[in-house]
């Protein structure tokens, strides 16, 4: 199994994707999960010359001996009542699929929507309707769209596909040959044991987001910084016949001041300049190298590491 990680690891520390890709390379990674989670209307990728921007990072990756192997499309809620928000979400998601085609990426994760007070059946119906808007672009570009599990920690009492069984049921309900599943180990760790849930996905498991936490919050930290049972997950991936990349998604291993899951405690320094609010690039570089070496050790331990 080959190791990949997300460009979001350096989203806080670097201004451009070129810089982020170089940092991944520096840490030992050769396979890239391209994050397109936070596009804005003024993003270079949403402009008329977007293909030129994509070509830049493609050529950079090739020059470094790296490959784009997975992606995460625009974040947002397709079931939001804010029409402008949903309109941009759709445009950015379609653009992300087109970008995947140019980069040679075959699988991108597209989050499903959530809404209060709707049943599982209504959720299936509304989210299928959103995915159907992606079908023509998916088919034209040859890019699979993957749904992803979440957790009650994030979704509260709202229905969501938090289990492998429900994910597979939804994939089969959508009934399109280019809709599959991505399993997030951190989200699952907030729910409990996950061996049976991974097995329930079966051959619909096309990608993973590997991250750790303490089971109470969606922390997205590096392996062994939380309580995830790594043997359980590794055995499940082997037993289910998973053939994708071992893709890390541990982009908040270091806590920024306003991190959405757990912001840093506030301190009013008065007239003094506060100097220790944010983690620094040199810290993330250490974390990144550690993540690669840890992932390699994990895969080597089970005899499944592949360069």
Where in the sequence are the language-model features?
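Active-site acidic/histidine proton-transfer and metal-coordination neighborhood
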Residues: 59-63, 78-183, 190, 268-274, ...
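Conserved beta-strand positions in the central sheet of alpha/beta enzyme cores
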Residues: 33, 70, 109, 146, ...
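Short glycine-enriched, charge-decorated loop/helix-capping segments at active-site entrances
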Residues: 44-48, 83-86, 221-225
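Glycine-rich, proline-tolerant flexible connector loops at the mouths of alpha/beta enzymes
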Residues: 33-58, 118, 155
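Acidic (Asp/Glu)-rich catalytic clusters
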Residues: 21-28, 48-70, 94-104, 135-140, ...
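Active-site-proximal flexible loops/turns
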Residues: 13, 40-42, 77-79, 118, ...
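Histidine-acidic metal/acid-base catalytic patches
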Residues: 1-4, 14-28, 161-307
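Active-site beta-loop-alpha junctions enriched in small/polar residues
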Residues: 6-11, 35-39, 73-76, 113-115, ...
């Amino acid at each position: 199994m080959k190791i990949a990680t997300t460009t979001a690891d350096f989203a806080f520390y670097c201004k451009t994707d070129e810089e982020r890709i170089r940092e991944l390379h520096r840490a030992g990674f050769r396979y890239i999960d391209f994050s397109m989670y936070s596009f804005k209307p003024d993003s270079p990728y949403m402009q008329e010359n977007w293909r030129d921007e994509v070509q830049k990072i493609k050529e950079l990756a090739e020059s470094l001996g790296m490959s784009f192997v997975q992606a995460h499309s625009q974040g947002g809620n397709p079931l939001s009542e804010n029409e402008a928000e949903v309109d941009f979400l759709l445009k950015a998601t379609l653009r992300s699929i087109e970008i995947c085609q140019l980069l040679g990426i075959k699988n991108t994760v597209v989050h499903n929507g959530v809404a209060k007070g709707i049943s599982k059946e209504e959720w299936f119906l509304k989210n299928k309707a959103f995915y159907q808007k992606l079908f023509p672009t998916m088919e034209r570009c040859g890019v699979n769209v993957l749904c992803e599990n979440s957790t009650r920690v994030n979704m509260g009492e709202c229905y969501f596909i938090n289990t492998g069984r429900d994910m597979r049921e939804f994939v089969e309900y959508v009934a399109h040959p280019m809709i599959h599943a991505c399993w997030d180990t951190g989200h699952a760790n907030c729910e409990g044991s996950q061996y049976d849930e991974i097995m329930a996905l079966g051959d619909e498991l096309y990608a993973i987001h590997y991250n750790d936490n303490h089971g109470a919050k969606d922390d997205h930290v590096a392996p062994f910084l939380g309580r995830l049972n790594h043997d359980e997950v590794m055995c499940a991936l082997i037993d289910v016949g998973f053939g994708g990349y071992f893709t890390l998604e541990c982009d908040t291993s270091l806590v920024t001041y306003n991190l959405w899951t757990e912001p840093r405690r506030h301190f009013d320094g008065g007239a003094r300049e506060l100097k220790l609010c944010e983690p620094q690039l040199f810290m993330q570089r250490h974390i990144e190298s550690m993540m690669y070496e840890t992932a390699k050790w994990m895969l080597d331990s089970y005899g499944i590491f592949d360069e």
